[in-house]
């Protein structure tokens, strides 16, 4: 697809301006930031995760509005492209999933994730947490799949550590999938997250979840 490029873009960073004249995607970016603005993220009493979901559900995907952020890399399963930091309260990312690729099974570093499909479809596998007593005793504790869901263009999903672990994959062997993710607080970017082995249940921590691009500019 023409808006997926494995190269450095010459686009200028987004500079906040008056909402008037912005397209629907960048209006969504502003609205998400406004909802999170007075708080420290979705854990705060004055923010309802449903408000985030409703805002994302109200946006109809238009690739001309977000394509500048959709940078891909064929050497990776997917790329994490930063769009906005929500006044330091969150990370809003466009993820580009290569055909047939998937994420590892992972947690969310005690943060909340709201995800919208911008293009294509993604498959989510959810898992129970492994039994910590077995892990501490050096025993294998294979992860149990609790739910499988196909998410299609414009659908929205919510995930947090309270719901378990998950893995996201692009089931299409020929086409990219693209999704918009809001993480709040932005713990994974600052402190990393844990990846899990499906057969043993054992985990290892990665120190930081890095970005492939920042506001349309490849890093």
From Swiss-Prot:
Disulfide bonds: none annotated. Its EC number is 1.13.11.20. The thioether cross-link between Cys-113 and Tyr-183 plays a structural role through stabilizing the Fe(2+) ion, and prevents the production of highly damaging free hydroxyl radicals by holding the oxygen radical via hydroxyl hydrogen. It catalyses: L-cysteine + O2 = 3-sulfino-L-alanine + H(+). CDD domains: cupin_CDO. Cysteine dioxygenase involved in sulfite formation from cysteine. Required for keratin degradation and plays an important role in filamentous growth and virulence. Belongs to the cysteine dioxygenase family. This is Cysteine dioxygenase. It comes from Arthroderma benhamiae (Trichophyton mentagrophytes). The lineage of its organism: Eukaryota, Fungi, Dikarya, Ascomycota, Pezizomycotina.
């Amino acid at each position: 697809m023409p808006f997926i490029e494995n190269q450095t873009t010459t686009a200028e960073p987004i500079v906040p301006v008056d909402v008037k004249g912005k397209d629907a995607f960048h209006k969504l970016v502003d609205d998400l930031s406004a909802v999170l603005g007075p708080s420290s993220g979705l854990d705060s009493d004055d923010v309802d995760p449903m408000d985030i979901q409703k805002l994302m559900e109200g946006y109809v995907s238009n690739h001309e509005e977000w394509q500048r952020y959709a940078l891909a890399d064929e050497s990776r399963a997917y790329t994490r492209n930063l769009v906005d930091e929500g006044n330091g309260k969150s990370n809003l990312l466009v993820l580009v999933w290569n055909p047939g690729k998937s994420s590892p099974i992972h947690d969310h570093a005690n943060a909340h994730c709201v995800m919208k499909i911008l293009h294509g479809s993604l498959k989510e596998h959810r898992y129970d947490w492994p039994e910590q007593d077995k892990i501490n005793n050096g025993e294998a504790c294979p992860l149990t799949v609790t739910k499988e869901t196909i998410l299609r263009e414009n659908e929205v999903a919510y995930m947090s550590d309270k719901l378990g672990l998950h893995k996201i994959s692009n089931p299409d062997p020929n086409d990219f999938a693209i999704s918009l993710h809001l993480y709040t607080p932005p713990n994974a970017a600052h402190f990393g997250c844990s990846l899990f082995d499906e057969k043993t249940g054992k985990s290892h921590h990665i120190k930081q979840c890095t970005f492939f691009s920042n506001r349309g500019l490849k890093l």
